[in-house]
């Protein structure tokens, strides 16, 4: 049968605990260094109702996350660590180690995107049919998922020649709202190369910003010819009906992530971590040392 996936963060905690108790494998893991912990944590925090920053009428930015919602989200992490004990032994890890924890079967669940699926299979030797993708668990304020990471943008100060080159590169990737014969050829070549390397080709795009039905039809026809995984393992993930897709915070994201990393590490490594103090100092730090210094 198909795996039973957690619909809420509370269910994730409970399922992760059961997995660890029955198998000895950590039920869940998150990164905690190099700004990756804060980056991943945004999804959890938003679902608890946290907003991190806000632009004031005078144009200045204000840290607004010294709130009960932020404390509740941190408490959830604390409970995962100290109440449910679901994490692997190594809890201070970067993004590379984070992926490794999963593909070496040291953790059953992680937060990642389908663009990492091929790497997980080719690097770690996992059976591609043993990977199941599900949408983000729901929190008290809803179900949030961060967009970004694979976005392509044009620099406003580009020359016309640079913009032309960028468009040609996007066409080479097939990252366009239309599919020409040349783009179709490139997509097919990419699929063949992925399969040759042992990676994953999905039967359809799992997430697309393009609304063109013609493009969708052509893409699904191409991918359908090369697909090498069971689409049922990804159907839950593809149901966006109740998912709020949200971009990263507007300004100084990396500085915010670094501060959140430190908070998460404190929670992971210290049972007597003071949630109230951590929340207050994190917001003050972000305001005083970063937002207030913006030009």
PLM features: residue spans?
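Glycine-centered hinge/linker elements that transmit conformational signals in sensory
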Residues: 13-18, 59-91, 132, 136
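Extracytoplasmic/periplasmic solute-binding protein
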Residues: 10-62, 78, 107
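Bilobed periplasmic-binding protein-like "clamshell/Venus-flytrap" ligand-binding domains
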Residues: 21-34, 176-185, 288-295
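Beta->alpha turn/N-cap motifs
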Residues: 95, 112-120, 150
């Amino acid at each position: 049968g198909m795996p039973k996936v957690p619909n809420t963060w509370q269910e994730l905690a409970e399922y992760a605990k059961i997995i660890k108790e029955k198998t000895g494998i950590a039920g869940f893991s998150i990164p905690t260094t190099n700004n990756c912990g804060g980056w991943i944590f945004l999804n959890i925090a938003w679902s608890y109702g946290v907003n991190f920053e806000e632009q004031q009428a005078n144009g200045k930015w204000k840290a607004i996350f010294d709130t009960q919602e932020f404390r509740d989200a941190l408490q959830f992490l604390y409970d995962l660590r100290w109440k449910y004990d679901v994490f692997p032994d190594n809890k201070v890890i970067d993004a590379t180690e984070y992926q490794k924890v999963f593909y070496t079967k040291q953790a059953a669940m992680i937060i990642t995107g389908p663009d990492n699926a091929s790497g997980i299979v080719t690097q770690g030797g996992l059976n591609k049919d043993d990977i199941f993708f599900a949408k983000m668990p729901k929190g008290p304020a809803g179900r949030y998922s961060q967009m970004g990471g694979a976005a392509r943008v044009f620099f406003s100060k580009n020359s016309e020649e640079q913009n032309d080159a960028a468009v040609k590169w996007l066409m080479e990737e097939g990252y366009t709202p239309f599919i020409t014969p040349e783009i179709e050829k490139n997509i097919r070549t990419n699929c063949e190369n992925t399969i040759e390397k042992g990676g994953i080709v999905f039967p359809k795009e799992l997430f697309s910003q393009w609304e063109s039905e013609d493009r969708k039809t052509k893409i699904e026809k191409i991918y359908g010819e090369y697909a090498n995984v069971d689409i049922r393992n990804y159907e839950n993930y593809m149901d966006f009906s109740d998912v709020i897709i949200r971009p990263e915070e507007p300004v100084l994201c990396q500085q915010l992530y670094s501060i959140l990393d430190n908070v998460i590490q404190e929670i992971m490594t210290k049972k007597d971590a003071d949630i109230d103090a951590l929340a207050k100092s994190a917001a003050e730090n972000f305001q005083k040392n970063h937002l207030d210094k913006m030009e």
